[in-house]
Amino acid sequence: MYDPMATAMNLVPMVVEQTSRGERAFDIFSRLLKERIIFLTGPVEDGMASLICAQLLFLESENPKKEIAMYINSPGGVVTAGLAIYDTMQYIKSPVSTVCMGMAASMGSLLLQAGAPGHRIALPNARIMVHQPSGGFRGQASDIERHAEDIIKTKRRLNEIYVKHTGRTYEEVEKTLDRDHFMSAEEAKAWGLIDHINESRDEADEKA
């Protein structure tokens, strides 16, 4: 089956740098990692979460006081994988700024609003979508009941995280997340998911 994400990753360009020891070649994402820039793109799943968490922990070990920039373009994905990234963002000492380019939906929106206060950014044409968790399970009635109880607990926990970072009341969050709720960058700012909408690098530097 054709996988556009895999195809794109196979076309990642290389960057050649001159050093005192000669030339060194980096893929573009590794080169940006040297500048403390992380890309969270595509569906949020366990493999991606491991890579993102490892990058966050590595950059913290390099300089715990220096900011890390996380660029997000994601349709969301697995809740547990997203919460692993969220917890690591909160756990490390380095402040993490978040930038939405394209789309931050579902778990992507939760990670966007989890950036350091004052450093949550969207580009002008970014779209943000929030909603409650979804899932499915087949099995014995008692097992289905337990899974239903667990997803309700998960829903409550995710709502509490949105409350913490947006300043909205629990009731407001629960009502907004009841169905797929799409927002423009301006609407996301008004709702408290982001702090700034930046059209240019100069504008971002002025607000830094």
Swiss-Prot record:
* Molecular functions (GO terms): ATP-dependent peptidase activity; ATPase binding; serine-type endopeptidase activity
Q: Which PROSITE patterns match?
A: CLP_PROTEASE_HIS (PS00382), CLP_PROTEASE_SER (PS00381)
Gene Ontology biological process terms from the UniProt entry: protein quality control for misfolded or incompletely synthesized proteins
**EC numbers on record:** 3.4.21.92
Q: Which CDD domains match?
A: S14_ClpP_2
Family according to the record: Belongs to the peptidase S14 family.
Catalytic activity annotation = Hydrolysis of proteins to small peptides in the presence of ATP and magnesium. alpha-casein is the usual test substrate. In the absence of ATP, only oligopeptides shorter than five residues are hydrolyzed (such as succinyl-Leu-Tyr-|-NHMec, and Leu-Tyr-Leu-|-Tyr-Trp, in which cleavage of the -Tyr-|-Leu- and -Tyr-|-Trp bonds also occurs)
Subcellular compartments? Cytoplasm
User: What NCBIfam families does this protein's entry cite?
Assistant: PRK00277.1 (NF001368), PRK12553.1 (NF009205)
Q: Which InterPro entries match?
A: ClpP, ClpP/crotonase-like_dom_sf, ClpP/TepA, ClpP_His_AS, ClpP_Ser_AS
Q: Can you state the subunit structure given in the record?
A: Fourteen ClpP subunits assemble into 2 heptameric rings which stack back to back to give a disk-like structure with a central cavity, resembling the structure of eukaryotic proteasomes.
- Top-level lineage group: Bacteria
Q: What is this protein called?
A: ATP-dependent Clp protease proteolytic subunit
**Listed GO cellular component terms?**
cytoplasm; endopeptidase Clp complex
Please tell me whether the keyword ATP-binding is annotated for this protein: no
The record's keywords, sorted A to Z, are: Cytoplasm, Hydrolase, Protease, Serine protease
What gene makes this protein? clpP
HAMAP family assigned: ClpP (MF_00444)
**Organism field:** Caulobacter sp. (strain K31)
> What is known about what this protein does?
Cleaves peptides in various proteins in a process that requires ATP hydrolysis. Has a chymotrypsin-like activity. Plays a major role in the degradation of misfolded proteins.
